[in-house]
Design a protein with these regions (language model features):
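C-terminal, well-structured catalytic/ligand-binding subdomain of enzymes
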Residues: 1-41, 46-52, 56-82, 113-335
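Intrinsically disordered, low-complexity linker/loop segments enriched in Gly/Pro
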Residues: 74-107, 112
Length: 335
């Protein structure tokens, strides 16, 4: 099954997941939204009933955004989820939007469809570059917060890119990558490529958040979309595995097109999800700093048991989601 992963860092640290129904002219989809987005205007990762999935990472080394229109990545992805069935539909949507004026984005968009086509689209206001998955070594593409088409300057997140590449090297080589590889591995790992060690695994008591490891204080979600196998109905079998709040301490709950786990839904005041609110409170208890000019320090001693608790809870979330999917596949095969 194809996988699309997003480890989200954002100033909008409370998120929720919800389903948006189809209309006469748009597709149904399920996506991650910022808390408070009652109109579901900006999707940050999601998939639709046709099996098209999309996410983004902000890019800081593409052409400077001088347009009055900006920060439209979530709006672009919402439109893509409403209308795109194939990966090629997404680039066609970008072509149409660019022809009308500045797109208002500086982003790496990752996307795939139910036919197995996919890749990264590094996109700025007036142009984009496609990196097809079919041409990628080992069948995987990794992006942080810079674009390969953007040159050598301002490669924000370069160390985190190296972190992810190092942590994925063995699973890719052994062809053992699963959703858990990301939510239970990379999003909980404090591996630093420059030091060649995982600080959460070698007895370190505290670590400074300097933006050089995958989890950060501003990490608000870890999400993996798992695509359909050939012949499956994506509307019935695709799953979005979602860890909200602070991913190292949180746990995974499943979201399907017609079935979203209650902990992910915006059931609290202000369109907030219970899991997000709970885990952000936990996060706040783990970080401290001397003053506003000092880096945030994470208490690894307190975090370690929470990581293990989260993994146990995630195992149950994966079990429930897979049981539901397997039942649907079984029912379809007997009809």
């Amino acid at each position: 099954r194809m996988l699309l992963w997003k480890h989200r860092d954002t100033g909008h640290q409370e998120n929720f997941v919800d389903r948006v129904a189809a209309t006469d002219s748009t597709l149904a989809y399920v996506a991650l939204f910022n808390a408070g987005d009652s109109l579901r205007r900006e999707a940050w990762i999601g998939f639709n009933e046709a099996g098209f999935a999309v996410m983004n990472t902000a890019s800081y080394n593409l052409a400077p955004d001088t347009a009055r229109v900006r920060d439209r990545e979530g709006i672009v992805m919402t439109e893509a989820l409403r209308r795109c069935r194939r990966f090629g539909d997404f680039t066609a949507l970008l072509d149409s939007a660019i022809a009308s004026g500045p797109l208002g984005v500086q982003a790496n968009f990752g996307a795939f469809d139910a036919e197995g086509d996919g890749g990264y689209v590094e996109c700025s206001d007036h142009t984009y570059t496609v990196y097809p998955l079919a041409l990628a070594p080992e069948g995987a593409i990794i992006r942080s917060n810079y674009s390969f088409s953007g040159g050598k300057e301002r490669q924000l997140g370069a160390v985190r890119q190296c972190d992810a590449e190092a942590l994925l090297a063995e699973p890719l080589r052994e062809r053992s990558v699963r959703p858990e590889t990301f939510t239970e591995g990379l999003s909980r790992s404090f591996y630093h490529a420059g030091e060649g060690r995982d600080l959460s695994a070698d007895g370190a008591m505290r670590v400074a958040d300097r933006g050089e490891m995958i989890p950060r204080r501003i990490s608000s979600a870890s999400v993996v979309i798992e695509g359909p196998l050939p012949g499956e109905n994506p509307a019935e079998t695709m799953v979005m595995w979602v860890s909200l709040g602070f991913p190292p301490a949180s746990h995974v709950e499943p979201a399907m097109l017609d079935s979203v786990a209650p902990a992910l839904l915006p059931s609290e005041p202000g369109c907030r999800a219970p899991l997000s609110s709970e885990m952000l409170s936990v996060r706040d208890s783990l970080f401290s700093r001397r003053d506003a000019s000092s880096p945030w320090m994470l208490d690894l001693t307190r975090l370690r048991p929470l990581i293990e608790d989260g993994r146990r809870a995630s195992a149950e979330g994966y079990r429930r989601g897979r049981a539901l999917r397997d039942n649907r596949i079984s029912e379809s095969s007997t009809e």
